[in-house]
Amino acid sequence: MPEILNHTLILEKIKNLGASPGCYLWKSKKGEVLYVGKAKNLDKRVRSYLKENHPDVKTKVLQREIFDLDWIATGTEKEALILEATLIKKHNPRFNVRLKDDKKYPYICVSLSEPYPMVYVTRKLKDNGDRYFGPYSDVKSTRETLDIILRIFPVRKTRQVLPLPRPRRPCLNFDMGRCLGPCQGNIPVEDYKVIIDQVIQFLEGRKESLVSDLNIKMSNASERLDFEKAARYRDMLQRIQNFREKQTVVSLEGGDEDVIGFARKQDEGQVILLEIRGGRLETKKSFPIQGVLDAENSEILGAFFRDYYLNASLVPPCIFIPADIQDEVIPVIDVLQEKTGFRPKIKFPKGGDKRSLLKIAEKNAELGLSERLLATHYRDQTASLKEIQEMFSLERLPHIIECYDISHFQGSQPVASGVMFVEGKPFKQGYRKYNIRGYEGINDPGMIHEVISRRLQRIINEEGVFPDLIVIDGGLTQLTKACEAAVEAGAEGIPMVGLAKKREEIFFPGENEPFIFDMNSPGMKLLRHLRDEAHRFGVSHHRSRRNKETMRSLIQEVPDIGFKRSKLLLQHFSGEKKIEEATKEELLLVPGIGENLAEKILKQLQKKE
């Protein structure tokens, strides 16, 4: 039986499901909607979640949190698809793959519900006859598109209900020729509508037909000797041409297409959508995707396809996808056909120019994802450093933090490790290994004193940069000895703390009692990472040193080997590990090693095993 908290109650509920299409909602004990799904057959689909040893990792995790079930039956599978998208937007379930913050994606609105429509950016979609274009991936790109439109087309920019009871004074846009003055009643509604139709053509990507239309209108105006209107069309044509010259030609065939690229890493995904209109790359849209950790690529791309195209104002005749996900997108295509009256083609090119376009989109998705993860990491690390600064009352952010740890086996072969984190990340060039010189046996505080003394003295001698914080892996005794070393070196101003493993206690100089901070806070997570890295590095160095000394003693115990030939062996094989793996023939290649001695070496190595 799978790990479902309320298994019996859910089985009772399933009895009433039936075989109709619809949507199901898995809920937690607190009533949180965990996952929304659609099904052609609700009963069959929901029962699939009750299987033991489910092959899907994400479903196994979901099973452990399921407590309740809700469902909504629909008349058709298409209705279930539309309802699924609506429910995911409403509840934002954490087990669903979804567009990140998709409720906030901006659109460009053409307010056709007004006699003199405006063109503006909005996030609110109203069912009042206005036309919406989008969604765009961010406000910046949306405003850039809007600015281009407002430079090309002389539409009104001020938000007020027109026509006004009485004409107002013309604004600066009218004086500059960027508006035709509908607020003054200078342009009839019919003439203004012609300009709005041109804006819509532009937003729909039909720029070739728009240019052709404007050329005809300019010629007709010239023939009528309406030179003012002809000049206006000429200026619009010039601005459109300037805009088009900046666009990259990606297809000599022309045509309207969308090209989808995808990248993923950890629990984050990124989709890049290249909008090609009239053979030119018109827009690059970038969409972060959430909840991709254990999801298949087909599920992720299918979810994007659903969330984007069911809300898109325009769907091109052809869409190129980076994987064969026909099964996932066919229900969406069916709905789009009902909405638009045509069925877009979905293609998965395996070669040629279209495959090259897909690779461009995929490369852009990889770059966009890397940039986003880097920004997130930097933001998280900065938060961690700020918290550490507050925890330890530091004068400045701890840009450089060092941590020191002692490793030995019952006091033998003692070593120390020092690791350095810069801006919250490991800085491997700053890592240091130390063989303890002045202490034998178990004396961790004394060894810490030696290592800190050596480290600080080296910084002073080389005129280096002191760290902003030193963390000692240990308790109050080790920390006290480290502080003594700093005072002796004349570097007592460096902040130091001790981090004990037992309860993750923090010790401060001069304070007998430790402090305990929130284990899951960003600052403590970074400090534990630092301490664990110092421990790992120290254990690795200690193991290496112990193995070397063990090997040297083993070789020196070989009868008749002597110091000189031991040294030749180590030099020839460049290390002890290769001596362990050597054959008799390989040993004979070492100067001074004959058959008799080679056999003695092999026997000695066998004793070790």
UniProtKB/Swiss-Prot annotation:
Cystines in this chain: none
Residue ranges of coiled coil: none
Record's keyword annotation contains Manganese: no
GO CC field: cytoplasm; excinuclease repair complex
Domain spans labelled GIY-YIG: 19-97
Listed GO biological process terms: nucleotide-excision repair; SOS response
CDD domains in the record: GIY-YIG_UvrC_Cho
Keywords linked to the UniProt accession: Cytoplasm, DNA damage, DNA excision, DNA repair, Excision nuclease, SOS response
Cellular location(s): Cytoplasm
UVR domain sequence ranges: 208-243
Pfam families named in the record: GIY-YIG, HHH_5, UVR, UvrC_RNaseH, UvrC_RNaseH_dom
Listed GO MF terms: DNA binding; excinuclease ABC activity
PROSITE patterns: GIY_YIG (PS50164), UVR (PS50151), UVRC (PS50165)
Function: The UvrABC repair system catalyzes the recognition and processing of DNA lesions. UvrC both incises the 5' and 3' sides of the lesion. The N-terminal half is responsible for the 3' incision and the C-terminal half is responsible for the 5' incision.
Family: Belongs to the UvrC family.
Subunit structure: Interacts with UvrB in an incision complex.
NCBIfam families: PRK00558.1-5, uvrC
Name of the featured protein: UvrABC system protein C
Gene that this sequence comes from: uvrC
